[in-house]
Amino acid sequence: MSVKIEVWGDYASFNRPEMKVERVSYDVMTPSAARGILEAIYWHPGLRWQIDRIYVRAPIRFTNIRRNEVKDKLNSRKARTVMEQGRGEMYLATSESIQQRAAMVLRDVRYVIEAHFDMTENAAEGDNPGKFQDIIKRRAEKGQFYHQPYFGTREFPVNFKLCDGMPECPKELLGERDLGWMLLDMDYSDPSDIKPVFFRAVMKDGVLDVPPMRGKGVAR
């Protein structure tokens, strides 16, 4: 069953994986980020979200900022040793490893997420699509969420509401624009070998059609 949620915010950053040092955002929201927003509003083991379309409803504008980040990572081998032996330190001293990095992020963003959900084998006997649809709409209308949804990073919170009327497409987004290869989502079908999945993103009149995970043109 289909649902449309309008989302907007001051800033967004959907980081390109090929940019290793400085953060550079994709031009528009990625399907995986859209799924994350919907799961923040309503998640249930009995349903699985599938993003169908992303409507871009604000001009694409970039700005440069500097963000504080931690340069170190927790070492999995060290963490395992601490857990097994019960001694040692397993933390990051952010005051010692903090550093500033430049980031090219989006500003003044607005999207409409069109998605549907499929029932899964984990649905309870009393679960059904109509029940889930009512819960989702009620939560969106009341602004309820399990955790604060965000645009790519928790520093950029999302405002949202149930879409009751499609905003107009900005004139500068009319026509066709090739956005290149974009992250579709992560493939968790094999927990021991999680892989990124990409698709060729083409925006037409401000609308990005999203293929299914195993659809035509999807690359692993």
Question: Can you describe what each PLM-predicted range is?
Answer:
Residues 9-11, 55-56, 70-73:
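A short glycine/small-residue-enriched secondary-structure motif
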Residues 1-21, 204-206, 211:
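N-terminal, Lys/Arg- and Ser/Thr-rich interaction peptides
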Residues 3, 28-32, 85-92:
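Short linear motifs at secondary-structure transitions and domain/linker junctions
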Residues 7-11, 58, 113-121:
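Beta-strand elements of well-folded, non-transmembrane domains
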Residues 69-71, 79-220:
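Internal, well-folded beta-alpha domain core
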